[in-house]
UniProtKB/Swiss-Prot annotation:
Localization (cell): Cytoplasm; Dynein axonemal particle
Gene Ontology process terms (BP): axonemal dynein complex assembly; single fertilization
GO molecular function: GTP binding; hydrolase activity
Any one Pfam family match given in the protein's UniProt record, by short name: TPR_1
Native species: Mus musculus
Protein name per its UniProtKB record: Sperm-associated antigen 1
Residues recorded with modification Phosphoserine: 351, 359, 703, 739-740, 766
Alphabetic keyword roster: Cytoplasm, Fertilization, GTP-binding, Hydrolase, Nucleotide-binding, Phosphoprotein, Repeat, TPR repeat
Any coiled-coil regions, as ranges: none
Function: May play a role in the cytoplasmic assembly of the ciliary dynein arms. May play a role in fertilization. Binds GTP and has GTPase activity.
Length: 901
C-alpha cells in the first residue's frame, strides 16, 4: 500500500501547481502563517494572484500581510499602477498640465523658426550662403550624372603575344614604384589642401557655434598628439573661425611653437591674453617665444608672473633659470672686469667672508676648498695628459666656460637684474663694504667684489695692527676674487699680506697654494699645502693636492725632489685653528692649551669620539673615522693612540703622506711605539721609498709581539729559510691588534682571515690550538658571506653558532641572498643542533623558519643526502623535546613538514 502511494502521489495528495511546482497543500492559511521562507511565499503569492488554481481574495490578502511582515521591501509586494488619464486629476490640475504642454510646444516652434528663417531686413545677405529649401524644383540626380560620366573611361585591352616578347619586367616594376611614390606625395599635399581654414557660421546660434568650435578643436588636439602640427594649426584656425576662445589661441600658439613660427605664436598668445588676461599657459608660451626672439627681459617678466600664480610650476622655474643665465651672459663686460682674465668657474665658494657669523663661514671643509680650486685640477690633468709643461696664464675661456660661472648662484644675489651695482662709496663703513662684497662674490661678480674689498682695506689700513684680523680677512677675500678671475700674482700678494697680519691662517695658505699651482710653481704650492696639513690634516683638498703635486715633482725632479723644496715652516702647537672653531666661539677666543689637563667632560667626550671612530673603522668607514679622530685630537693632541689609529685609516685609503705624518707625530710622543714604527714603514713603502722601508721593520723586530712586522720584512727581503715538510699555502694576513685601549676593533673580515691555517706539524713539535675567531655582527650580505665562508673553511661550528646568535632571524634570508650551498646549509644545521638548541630553542625555531624562506632552499632539500637528512631530523627531535614558552609541538611539526621530513 505504501509503495503504491509513492508511485501515485496524486491519489493521496493534491498535486502541484503548474508554475513553480508548489504543492497544493501549501496554499493554506496555516502553512502560510508558519512559513518563514520569503522566496517561497513570493512564489505562493504569485500563484494566488495569477488565478491558475482559483481566486482566493482573503488568502491572497493574508499572504501579502505575512510577506510584508517578513520582507517589507520585497518586489512581489509591488502592484502595477496604470497610466493616469485626465479623469485621474481634478479640473484645475488638468488645466495647468495642459497649458504647460501647449506653452512648451509653442516655444519649441518659435525657436525652430528663429534658427532657420530670418527676416531679410534684419539679416541682409544671409540667404546666399544657405542651401535652398528642399522642394519639387530641386534636382537630386546631379551626383549620379557625374558618376556615370566618370565611368566612361577607356577599357584596358589585354596584351597580345607579340608584345609579351618585348616586355621588360624590371622597367615595368620601376614604373609602378615611381607612380606609387608620386601618388603618395600628391595625396599628402591634397590632404592638407582639402582642409578649409574657415567655417561658414552664418545663421547658427551660439550653441551651434560652440559645438562646431569644440569639435574642430578636438580634431586639432588629435593631430597635435600625433605630431602633425601643420594639420593641428589648420584645425585650430577652423575652430577660431567658428568661435574665438583663449583655449584655441593657446593651442594654436603651442603648435606654432613646435613649428618654430615665433611671430605667429606671439600674436596668438597676445590674443589669448586679451580674452583672458591672467591665462598662465599664454604667459608661459609667450615667454618661450620671447626667449627664442632674444627678448630676455620680457621673458623674465612673464615667467615671474607665472610663478606668482603657480609657485610650484617646474617648467616655469627651469625656463626662468635658463633665461636668467642667458640674460647674465649677454650683459656687457664692465671696465673693472676687463682688467683680469676670466677662468672657468665650476661652482661658487660657500662664503667669501672668513669672519662672518655662523658656523658655515667659520668652518673650513673640503667642499668650499674644492669650490675655491676652480678649474685648476682639470687644467693640471689636461697638462699631464698632453705631456707638455707650457703655461696657461694667457688662455681665455670660451663662451661655454663663461656660462658655467653663474650656475651656482645663491638666493642672495639678484640674478635677474641686468644692471651692475653702483661703485663703492667711501662713506660706507668697512663691515658694510665687506658684506656687499660677499654678496657680489656669491653672485659671481668677482671684479665688483674685489673693488668693495679694496675700499674697505683702504679705510682700515691707517689703523695698522688694531684691526689686523679684519684686514687679514679682507685681504684673503680679495685674494679669492683674484683667484676666480685668474689674476694669480695679485692673489699671491694679498695672501702674503693676510699671512703677515695673521700667520698660519688656513684660507690664505690654501689660496696661495692654488695660485702657485696655477702658475706651475709646484714647490711653493707643495710647501703651502704641507703647512695647511700641519695646521689641520683633516682638510681633504690639501691632502689630495699635496699627493698630486708630489707625483708631478717626482716626474720633474726624480727621486730627489724633496731636496729641492723650500723649507717647510714649523707650525707652533699653540696656534689656534680659527676656521675650525665651533659656531658659539669667536676667532678671538683662544682654545685650551695642549698642556692643560682636560676636564671630566672632555675625557668623556674624548672616549666617546674614540669609540665612535673605532666602530667606524670596524665598519670600514675610514673617512668618517678620520673626522672622529680629528675631533679627539682637538681635545687632546698628545694621545699617541689616536695618531696611530688615524694613520691606519690613511693607509687603508692609500693616503701614505698623511699616514707618514701621523706616524712621525706618534713617534715624537712615544719613540718606542711599535705600531707607529710599523705603519711608518708601510707608509714609506707606499711612497716607494724602498731604502727607508727596510729600516723600521728591522727595528720593530726587537719587540717580541711584532710578528706582523717580521712577516713584512720577510716578504720585502725574501730571506726567509725554506720550510720543512710539504709546501704550505700563503694566506693574506691583515693587520691584527691585540690592545683594545689603543686600537680600534678589527673588522669581521680581518678577524676571520687573520689566523693562518696550519697544514702540518713538524716532527717533534706540538700542534698549537687554532686561534678563536672573533665574529662581529655583519651589516650587509657581503660581510655575512665573507664571515660565513671563513667559518666554513675552518669547519668551526662554535663560531657559526655565535654568528647565528648575534644575527636577527628575520635578516637571515636577506644576508644569505642566493649563496646557500650544501656545505653552508649543513654547517648551519650542525651549529644549531650542537650549540643553540639546548640554550635557546625559540631562537633555533626562528632561524629554521626564516631559513626555509631563503633562496635556493627547495633546491638544497633535493640535493642533500640521507645522512644530512638524519642530522636535520635529530635537530627537530631535539627541538621537540626541549620545552620553551610560546613554542608548541604543532609548530615544530609544521616546520618539519617544510623541511620534507
Amino acid at each position: 500500500m505504501t509503495a503504491k502511494a509513492k508511485d501515485c502521489p496524486s491519489l493521496w495528495g493534491f498535486g502541484t501547481t503548474k508554475t513553480f511546482k508548489i504543492p497544493i497543500e501549501h496554499l493554506d492559511f496555516k502553512y502560510i502563517e508558519n512559513c518563514s521562507d520569503v522566496k517561497h511565499l513570493e512564489k505562493i503569492l504569485y500563484v494566488l494572484r495569477s488565478g491558475e488554481e482559483g481566486y482566493y481574495p482573503e488568502l491572497t490578502e493574508f499572504c501579502e500581510k505575512c510577506l510584508t511582515n517578513l520582507a517589507p521591501k520585497s518586489r512581489a509586494l509591488r502592484k502595477d499602477k496604470p497610466a493616469e488619464t485626465a479623469s485621474s486629476f481634478s479640473a484645475e490640475e488638468w488645466e495647468k498640465i495642459d497649458s504647460d504642454l501647449k506653452s512648451w510646444v509653442s516655444e519649441i516652434k518659435r525657436e525652430e523658426n528663429t534658427c532657420h528663417f530670418h527676416d531679410p531686413e534684419n539679416h541682409p545677405g544671409v540667404e546666399d550662403p544657405l542651401p535652398p529649401v528642399r522642394g519639387s524644383t530641386c534636382c537630386p540626380h546631379s551626383g549620379k550624372e557625374t558618376y556615370s560620366k566618370s565611368k566612361t573611361a577607356k577599357k584596358r585591352i589585354p596584351r597580345d603575344y607579340a608584345e609579351w616578347d618585348k616586355f621588360d619586367v624590371e622597367k615595368e616594376c620601376s614604373k609602378i614604384d615611381e607612380d606609387y611614390k608620386e601618388k603618395t606625395v600628391i595625396n599628402n599635399k591634397a590632404h592638407l589642401s582639402k582642409i578649409e581654414t574657415k567655417i561658414e557660421t552664418a545663421g547658427l546660434t551660439e550653441k551651434e557655434k560652440s559645438f562646431l568650435a569644440n569639435r574642430e578643436k578636438g580634431k586639432g588636439n588629435e593631430a597635435f598628439y600625433s605630431g602633425d602640427y601643420e594639420e593641428a594649426v589648420m584645425y585650430y584656425t577652423r575652430s577660431l573661425s567658428a568661435l574665438p576662445t583663449a583655449i584655441a589661441y593657446n593651442n594654436r600658439a603651442q603648435a606654432e611653437i613646435k613649428l618654430q613660427r615665433w611671430s605667429s605664436a606671439l600674436e596668438d598668445c597676445e590674443k589669448a591674453l586679451e580674452l583672458d588676461p591672467g591665462n598662465v599657459k599664454a604667459l608661459l608660451r609667450r615667454a618661450t617665444t620671447y626667449k627664442h626672439q632674444n627678448k630676455l627681459q620680457e621673458a623674465v617678466d612673464d615667467l615671474r608672473k607665472v610663478l606668482q600664480v603657480e609657485p610650484d610650476n617646474d617648467l616655469a622655474k627651469k625656463t626662468l633659470s635658463e633665461v636668467e643665465r642667458d640674460l647674465k651672459n649677454s650683459e656687457p663686460v664692465s671696465e673693472l672686469q676687463t682688467k683680469g682674465k676670466r677662468m672657468v668657474i665650476e661652482e661658487v665658494e660657500n662664503s667669501g667672508d672668513e669672519g662672518g657669523k655662523g658656523s658655515a663661514d667659520e668652518r673650513e671643509d673640503g667642499g668650499s676648498d674644492e669650490a675655491a680650486m676652480g678649474n685648476i685640477q682639470k687644467k693640471l690633468m689636461v697638462r699631464r695628459s698632453e705631456g707638455g709643461r707650457r703655461s696657461r696664464r694667457g688662455r681665455t675661456p670660451g663662451p661655454r666656460a663663461e656660462q658655467q660661472g653663474g650656475l651656482r648662484e645663491t638666493a642672495t644675489a639678484s640674478t635677474g637684474d641686468s644692471h651692475y651695482p653702483e661703485e663703492p662709496r667711501a662713506a660706507d663703513n668697512p663691515s658694510g663694504l665687506k658684506r656687499r662684497g660677499n654678496e657680489l662674490f656669491r653672485g659671481g661678480q668677482f671684479a665688483e667684489a674685489a673693488a668693495q674689498y679694496s675700499v674697505a682695506i683702504a679705510q682700515l689700513e691707517p689703523t695698522g695692527s688694531a684691526n689686523a684680523d679684519e684686514l687679514s680677512i679682507l685681504y684673503s677675500n680679495r685674494a679669492a676674487c683674484y683667484l676666480k678671475e685668474g689674476n694669480c700674482r695679485d692673489c699671491i700678494q694679498d695672501c702674503n699680506r693676510a699671512l703677515e697680519l695673521h700667520p698660519f691662517s688656513v684660507k690664505p695658505l690654501l689660496r696661495r697654494a692654488m695660485a702657485y699651482e696655477t702658475l706651475e710653481q709646484y714647490r711653493n704650492a707643495y710647501v703651502d699645502y704641507k703647512t695647511v696639513l700641519q695646521i689641520d690634516c683633516g682638510i681633504q683638498l690639501a691632502s689630495d693636492s699635496a699627493n698630486r703635486i708630489a707625483r708631478i715633482l717626482t716626474e720633474l725632479d726624480g727621486s730627489k725632489w724633496r731636496e729641492r723644496l723650500p723649507p717647510i715652516p714649523a707650525v707652533p702647537t699653540s696656534e689656534p685653528l680659527r676656521v675650525w672653531l665651533p659656531a658659539a666661539e669667536t676667532p678671538d677666543q683662544d682654545p685650551c692649551p695642549n698642556n692643560c689637563m682636560p676636564s671630566i667632560t672632555d675625557e668623556k667626550m674624548f672616549q666617546a669620539l674614540k669609540e665612535e671612530g673605532n666602530q667606524l673603522v670596524k665598519d670600514k668607514n675610514y673617512k668618517d673615522a678620520i673626522s672622529k679622530y680629528n675631533e679627539c685630537l682637538k681635545i687632546n693632541s698628545k694621545a699617541c693612540a689616536i695618531y696611530t689609529n688615524r694613520a691606519l685609516c690613511y693607509l687603508k685609503l692609500g693616503q701614505f703622506e698623511e699616514a707618514k705624518l701621523d706616524c712621525e707625530q706618534a713617534l715624537q710622543i712615544d719613540g718606542e711605539n711599535v705600531k707607529a714604527s710599523h705603519r711608518l714603514a708601510l707608509a714609506q713603502k707606499g711612497l716607494e721609498n724602498c731604502r727607508e722601508s727596510g729600516v723600521d721593520p728591522s727595528q720593530v723586530l726587537l719587540s717580541p709581539d711584532s710578528s706582523e712586522a717580521a712577516r713584512h720584512l720577510d716578504t720585502k727581503n725574501d730571506t726567509a729559510p725554506p720550510s720543512k715538510g710539504r709546501e704550505r699555502r700563503r694566506i693574506q694576513v691583515q693587520e691584527v691588534d691585540g690592545s683594545s685601549d689603543e686600537e680600534p676593533e678589527r673588522p669581521a673580515e680581518a678577524s676571520a682571515t687573520s689566523a693562518p691555517a696550519r697544514d702540518g706539524v713538524e716532527d717533534g713539535g706540538s700542534a698549537e690550538p687554532a686561534e678563536k675567531l672573533d665574529v662581529s655582527k655583519p651589516t650587509n650580505a657581503y660581510e655575512f658571506g665573507q664571515v660565513l665562508s671563513t667559518i666554513s673553511a675552518r669547519k668551526d661550528e662554535e663560531a657559526c653558532a655565535h654568528l647565528l646568535a648575534i644575527t636577527a632571524p628575520k635578516d637571515l634570508p636577506l644576508l644569505l641572498s642566493n649563496k646557500l650551498e650544501g656545505d653552508t646549509f649543513l654547517l648551519l644545521i650542525q651549529s644549531l643542533k650542537s650549540h643553540l638548541v639546548a640554550k635557546d630553542p625559540s631562537l633555533v625555531y626562528e632561524h629554521l623558519l626564516y631559513l626555509s624562506k631563503a633562496e635556493r632552499f627547495k633546491t638544497m632539500l633535493t640535493l642533500i643526502n640521507k645522512g644530512q637528512k638524519e642530522q636535520m631530523a635529530q635537530l627537530f627531535d631535539g627541538l621537540s623535546d626541549t620545552q620553551s614558552d610560546g613554542l608548541t609541538a604543532e609548530d615544530v611539526q609544521a616546520l618539519r613538514r617544510q623541511y620534507e621530513l
